[in-house]
Regions:
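Aromatic-acidic/polar surface patches that form glycan- and anion
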Residues: 9, 42, 62, 66
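Short glycine/serine/threonine-biased micro-segments
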Residues: 6-11, 44-45, 88
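Flexible, glycine-rich phosphate/dinucleotide-binding loops
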Residues: 13, 35-36, 58
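Dinucleotide-binding Rossmann-like beta1-alpha1 core, especially the glycine-rich loop
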Residues: 47-113
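Glycine-rich FAD pyrophosphate-binding loop
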Residues: 21-43
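Loop/helix-junction capping segments adjacent to catalytic residues or to phosphate/diphosphate-binding pockets
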Residues: 14, 39, 101
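Short secondary-structure boundary/capping segments within folded domains
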Residues: 19, 39-40, 83-86
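N-terminal Rossmann-like FAD-binding beta1-loop-alpha1 element of flavoenzymes
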Residues: 2-29
Length: 113
């Protein structure tokens, strides 16, 4: 099997490396930042997965892809060794009083059907 180099060890780079490694490829990850990933987008958002929270400002297909991805995380994490801190507890949407018309149960219900 050939060796594959992946430039960028953020979330996507790591997931691609994992997938290729499981297919038998030898993979090397390169990244300009620290190994801890403290400069990555996922670190900045604390790994927050909130497709419903993005619903006000994103096209419906983006929100639907977010829900599909959210369903995959427990399956992926179950295949990894070591500790992970994944909790799926729901979404709390907080808004200013003047925004209450935008954040109604009717708006969010269309994504939950």
């Amino acid at each position: 099997m050939p060796t594959i180099a992946i430039i960028g060890a953020g979330l996507m780079g790591r997931l691609i490396a994992l997938s290729l490694n499981r297919q038998g490829y030898q993979v090397t990850l390169f990244d300009k930042d620290q190994k801890s990933g403290q400069q990555s987008a996922a670190y900045a958002a604390a790994g927050l997965l909130t497709p419903l929270g993005e619903a006000m400002h994103s096209p419906r297909n983006i929100v639907e892809m977010g829900f599909a991805a959210l369903a995959l995380w427990p399956k992926l994490l179950a295949t990894l060794s070591g500790y992970n801190f994944f909790q799926q507890t729901g979404t709390l949407v907080v808004s200013h009083e003047q925004d209450i018309v935008d954040y109604t149960a009717q708006f969010f219900q269309k994504y939950l059907e």
